[in-house]
Regions:
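Bacterial N-terminal signal peptides
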Residues: 6-18
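Positively charged n-region of N-terminal signal peptides that target proteins for export
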Residues: 1-4
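Exported/periplasmic ABC-transporter solute-binding proteins
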Residues: 21-51, 55-74, 81-84, 88-105, ...
Length: 255
């Protein structure tokens, strides 16, 4: 009987520990502009390390695509956009947690070419017959594409380059087109250019050529993890996160 009791106790303790170990972690879903992929992945891991039992699930795409997902009911806790338009649209539909929205980062718009290509050194070189294709994000859903559209209009190159434009689903697709040599050049963020060893920056667009490139962040009203979402949002504004973002080429928001 004693052996049986000991075995039963051992089994009970084992089951308790198994159940405890299998307890699901708090999962936080963060949808963010794909231009933040490397830096936000590092920041999310830092957050997990300082918040035991929390798992951050990252969903990267163009800000416009993420906006549509949220509007269609995707279970998202935190949204970080590469443009104001997408965040404004969600705000106007009362989909954001009141008081949670804030500007996080700024970026710079640049023209990149494959690293070994030397025929483009200035913006005017895009008009050359040797330049056949220029990749930009689709301005309807990609903030970088909208900024590119504004910049080309500002520099009075829209008409001259219209037939050369190749539209991409997001800014990283633009980068991939340039890296592979499928296009002669592309317009991306400075952070995208920094993330690649296969491209070089041929031109930096002046800030006045387009709307300010600001990344707003907010908690979604539908979040079922509001406390953890608030903590993650606060962490995005921390010095620890700022160091990762600056390392990736982002700039803190101008006061």
């Amino acid at each position: 009987m004693k052996k049986l009791s000991s075995l039963s106790l051992l089994l009970a303790v084992s089951l308790f520990h198994t159940a405890f170990a299998a307890e699901p972690a708090t999962e936080l879903t963060v949808s963010a502009a794909i231009s933040m992929k490397e830096s936000l992945t590092a920041v999310a891991r830092d957050f997990e390390n300082s918040h035991a039992g929390t798992k951050v699930l990252l969903n990267f795409a163009s800000s416009g695509a993420l906006q549509k997902q949220i509007e269609n009911g995707a279970p998202v806790d935190v949204f970080v956009s590469a443009g104001m338009k997408e965040m404004n649209a969600l705000d106007q539909q009362s989909l954001l947690e009141p008081g949670s929205r804030g500007d996080l980062l700024e970026n710079t718009l640049v023209l990149v070419t494959p690293k070994e290509v030397e025929k483009i050194h200035a913006l005017g070189d895009l008009q050359s017959d040797d330049v056949k294709r220029l990749a930009v994000g689709d301005p309807k859903s990609v903030p970088a594409g909208l900024y590119a559209q504004q910049a080309l209009k500002f520099t009075q190159l829209t008409a001259a380059l219209q037939s050369k434009l190749v539209l991409a689903e997001n800014v990283r697709q633009v980068l991939a087109y340039v890296e592979s040599g499928n296009v002669d050049a592309g317009i991306v963020y400075a952070t995208d250019a920094q993330a690649s060893s296969k491209v070089r920056v041929a031109f930096v667009f002046p800030a006045e050529s387009h709307e300010p490139i600001v990344y707003p962040a907010a908690v979604l009203k539908a979040s079922k993890q509001e406390k953890t979402a608030d903590e993650f949002l606060a962490f995005l504004h921390s010095e620890t996160a700022k160091q990762e973002f600056v390392k990736a080429g982002f700039q803190p928001v101008s006061k």
